[in-house]
C-alpha cells in the first residue's frame, strides 16, 4: 500500500464518520456546516486519487526558490505587491522596513517600546510548546506581566513558552502607539466595513516566543491572507500552496472547516507525501529576520519554528483576491454560530469596487532617490479606520 493509498483509506473512514454526524444533526445550519466539511474531505480524497493514478514519479517536496521571493520595500509599492504577489498567491518576504516598524525606529529590535508601553500588562502565556499541535486548546498557560515574560525568553529561561496571537487593539491597546502596520495590507476589507465585525479589532496581534518553540502546521480560519512583521529574532517558516493541502495528511475529524495536520517535523520523519507540481502543490522555506515582513496567501498551510527569542506582530486580511472564499467560509461558520452572521453581512454588503486600483501596474512612487521606509507603513489607528488603503 502506497502513502497515497493509506491517506485515501483514512479519508474514506473520516468521510463516513462525518456524513453520519451530519445525518444525525437536527439543526439545519449545523448540518449544512458539517456537509461542507464532508465536501472538503471528498475534494482532498479526489485529489489524492488523481495523484495516485497519475503516478508520475513526482519529486520529493523540497522546493524552495525564487519561489520564496524576496524584494526590498524601496522597489515594491503596495500596488505592485497586490499585482505580483497577492493576485498570484505567491509568498514574499519584504525587506528594508526595520527602521519603520516601531516607534523606536532603528532601535526597535531592542524592544524597549514593548516593555515601556505594556510591560506591566498581564498576558496569558502558553507553556510546554502548546502550539506545536493543531489542537483546539492549549493545556498549560500562565498569566504574568509582559515585562517578566519578555525577560524570561530573552534570558533563555522560558523554554517552550509562547505569547501567541494576542490582539493589540483589544488586549494591549497601549502598544497601538508603538507598532506600525505595513502599508501593503492597509487596504484590508475587514477594516472598511460600515459596521464592526467580530474580527475588526483582532489585529495587529503580538507574538513573543522562546527559542525553539513552534506553531503547528495549520491553515488560518476563513481563508484569510496573513502578514507578519518581524521585530526581533528569526522565525523559520514553511509555507505550502493552497493546492498542497490534500498532500499534508489533513484531518477534519474535529469538525472545523480548517483541518488539523500532524506536526511538520513528524511528517518529515515518517515520510511526507510527494507534492506533485501538476496539481499545483508547492513548498517554500524561508527564514524571516528583523525588519522583514512576510506575506502568506489565504488558504496556504504553514508552520513556524522560532530559531531564537522572537518578537513579531501580525494579522489576517481580506481583499478582492480572497473575498469570495472568505465570504463562503464566514457564511458556513455563521450557520453553525449565528453570532457570526452579522460579521458575514457586514463584509458582504459593501461593494469595495477597487479591483482596478489593486491590479494597476503604475508603480509611480518608486523613486531613484533616498528611500524612506516610513512611507511603507501606517499607524494602527489609520489601519483600523480603513482610511489609508491603496
Predicted feature locations:
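N-terminal accessory scaffold of Fe(II)-dependent oxygenases
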Residues: 2-293, 301-390
Amino acid at each position: 500500500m502506497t502513502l497515497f493509498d493509506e491517506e485515501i483509506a483514512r479519508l474514506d473512514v473520516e468521510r463516513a464518520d462525518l456524513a453520519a454526524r451530519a445525518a444525525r444533526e437536527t439543526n439545519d445550519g449545523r448540518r449544512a456546516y458539517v456537509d461542507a466539511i464532508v465536501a472538503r474531505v471528498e475534494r482532498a480524497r479526489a485529489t489524492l486519487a488523481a495523484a495516485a493514478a497519475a503516478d508520475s514519479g513526482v519529486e520529493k517536496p523540497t522546493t524552495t526558490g525564487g519561489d520564496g521571493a524576496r524584494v526590498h520595500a524601496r522597489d515594491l509599492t503596495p500596488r505592485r505587491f497586490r499585482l505580483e504577489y497577492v493576485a498570484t498567491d505567491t509568498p514574499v518576504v519584504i525587506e528594508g522596513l526595520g527602521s519603520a516598524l516601531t516607534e523606536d525606529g532603528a532601535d526597535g529590535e531592542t524592544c524597549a517600546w514593548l516593555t515601556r508601553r505594556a510591560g506591566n500588562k498581564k498576558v496569558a502565556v502558553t507553556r510546554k510548546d502548546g502550539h506545536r499541535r493543531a489542537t483546539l486548546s492549549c493545556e498549560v498557560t500562565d498569566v504574568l506581566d509582559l515585562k517578566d515574560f519578555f525577560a524570561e525568553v530573552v534570558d533563555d529561561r522560558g523554554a517552550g513558552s509562547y505569547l501567541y496571537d494576542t490582539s493589540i487593539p483589544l488586549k494591549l491597546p497601549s502598544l497601538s502607539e508603538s507598532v506600525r502596520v505595513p502599508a501593503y495590507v492597509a487596504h484590508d476589507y475587514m477594516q472598511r466595513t460600515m459596521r464592526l465585525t467580530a474580527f475588526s479589532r483582532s489585529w495587529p496581534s503580538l507574538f513573543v516566543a522562546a527559542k525553539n518553540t513552534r506553531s503547528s502546521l495549520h491553515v488560518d480560519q476563513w481563508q484569510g491572507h496573513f502578514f507578519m512583521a518581524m521585530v526581533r529574532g528569526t522565525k523559520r517558516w514553511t509555507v505550502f500552496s493552497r493546492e498542497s493541502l490534500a498532500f499534508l495528511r489533513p484531518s477534519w475529524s474535529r469538525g472545523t472547516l480548517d483541518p488539523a495536520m500532524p506536526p511538520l517535523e513528524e511528517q518529515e520523519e515518517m515520510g511526507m507525501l510527494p507534492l506533485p507540481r501538476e496539481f499545483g502543490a508547492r513548498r517554500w522555506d524561508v527564514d524571516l529576520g528583523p525588519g522583514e515582513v512576510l506575506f502568506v496567501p489565504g488558504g496556504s498551510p504553514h508552520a513556524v519554528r522560532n530559531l531564537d527569542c522572537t518578537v513579531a506582530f501580525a494579522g489576517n486580511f481580506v481583499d478582492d483576491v480572497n473575498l469570495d472564499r472568505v465570504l463562503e467560509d464566514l457564511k458556513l461558520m455563521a450557520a453553525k454560530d449565528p453570532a457570526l452572521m452579522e460579521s458575514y453581512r457586514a463584509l458582504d454588503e459593501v461593494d469595495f469596487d477597487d479591483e482596478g486600483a489593486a491590479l494597476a501596474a503604475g508603480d509611480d512612487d518608486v523613486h531613484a532617490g533616498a528611500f524612506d521606509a516610513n512611507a511603507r507603513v501606517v499607524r494602527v489607528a489609520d489601519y483600523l479606520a480603513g482610511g489609508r488603503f491603496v
